[in-house]
Swiss-Prot record:
One of its GO terms (cellular component) is extracellular region. Induction: Expression is up-regulated in spores. Secreted effector that does not suppress pattern-triggered immunity (PTI) in plant host. A motif (RxLR) lies at residues 48-51. It is found in: Secreted; Host cytoplasm; Host nucleus. The keyword Hydrolase does not apply. This is Secreted RxLR effector protein RXLR-C251. Its main location: secreted. Has the canonical translocation RxLR motif, but lacks the canonical EER motif, which characterizes most oomycete effectors identified so far.
Amino acid sequence: MRFFYKLALMTTVASLACSDTALASTDLMPFNVAETQVSTHDIVSAGRSLRAEDTSTSIDNLRDPTMKEKIQFKLWYTRGKTPGQVHRDFFEGLDESIIVNNPNYEVWKMYEAYYNNKKGND
């Protein structure tokens, strides 16, 4: 009886070990989508979209901050960081054309709006 249990246990362990290696070596095929005129162009206007960059820094054009950004803004505000200090931390020594295209520029503009809103409420 004892031999039967050892044999069953060894068989189970061996089959689990083999199935893990078989699963690890399985490669998934990438899913590619062909670019067609329907998928890449506007059907209604059948025209090309404009590629002009919108570099306006209006507060109305800002997206809503994510939860992580809201927490970061609150942390900066409680530590007494002004938008100027945050701007210096992010962009010190960078050219203005590089700054405008930097993803942190939008975060800085949102913090500036947050800071001005908090200062206005105080």
